[in-house]
Amino acid sequence: MTDYKNKLINLLKENNVIKFGKFTLSSGRESDYYVDMKKAITEPEILDCVAHLITNEIEHDNIDKIAGPALGAVPIATATSLISKKPMLMIRKAKKTYGTSKQIEGELLENDDVVIVEDVTTTGGSLLKAINVIEDNGGNIVKAFVIVDREEGAQETFKENNIEFTPLLTISEFKKYL
């Protein structure tokens, strides 16, 4: 059996996804490392590895849909949907102002059990917004997965909101392999 976690760590290292130095994050905060997940989610081998890790965690659960917030999590949700054979949902940051005016692409039915995926979390705030969109539209979040948790509050955010949160890798775990 493939050890997907070690494979993921090696692929992230090989692709220089986690960079160390001085960086300014989108929030304006300074950080001594940067997680370049856009690079990771455009690599088929990384997506395949991530999709297998998530599918292995949910294969015995009664899951109806795999969801991913736009933009970064859509490739993750797509890959996981392909491996798990579960339909996917794409969650927009805001409702469209044209056409069908949807915020969720894909068919979310009342009481669908949904797994949501994300590329990287810091505090978990943006993923929580996507979770609220699903719940406001009748879906039930069963689990939340993230490729890399920066360990800056996401675990606590999800615990406070009674959401099972599983990082495939934490920044502390990654640093051990350097």
From Swiss-Prot:
Write down the required cofactor(s): Mg(2+)
Q: What class of enzyme is it?
A: transferase
According to its UniProt record, which protein family does this protein belong to?
Answer: Belongs to the purine/pyrimidine phosphoribosyltransferase family. PyrE subfamily.
Protein function: Catalyzes the transfer of a ribosyl phosphate group from 5-phosphoribose 1-diphosphate to orotate, leading to the formation of orotidine monophosphate (OMP).
Which keywords are on file for this protein?
Glycosyltransferase, Magnesium, Pyrimidine biosynthesis, Transferase
Q: Where does orotate bind?
A: T122, R150
The protein in question is named Orotate phosphoribosyltransferase
Instruction: Recite the lineage of the species.
Output: Archaea, Methanobacteriati, Methanobacteriota, Methanomada group, Methanobacteria
Which gene does this sequence derive from?
pyrE
A Pfam family that this protein carries is Pribosyltran
Under which EC number(s) is this enzyme classified?
2.4.2.10
Give me the reactions it catalyses.
Answer: orotidine 5'-phosphate + diphosphate = orotate + 5-phospho-alpha-D-ribose 1-diphosphate
What PANTHER family does the annotation carry?
A: OROTATE PHOSPHORIBOSYLTRANSFERASE, URIDINE 5'-MONOPHOSPHATE SYNTHASE
- Origin species: Methanosphaera stadtmanae (strain ATCC 43021 / DSM 3091 / JCM 11832 / MCB-3)
Q: How does it assemble?
A: Homodimer.
Q: Which GO biological process annotations does it have? A: 'de novo' UMP biosynthetic process; pyrimidine nucleobase biosynthetic process
Any one GO MF term held by the record is: orotate phosphoribosyltransferase activity
Q: Pathway involvement? A: Pyrimidine metabolism; UMP biosynthesis via de novo pathway; UMP from orotate: step 1/2
Q: Does the keyword Plastid apply?
A: no
Does Plastid show up as a keyword for this record?
A: no
User: Which residues are involved in binding 5-phospho-alpha-D-ribose 1-diphosphate?
Assistant: R92, K93, K96, E118, D119, V120, T121, T122, T123, G124, G125, S126
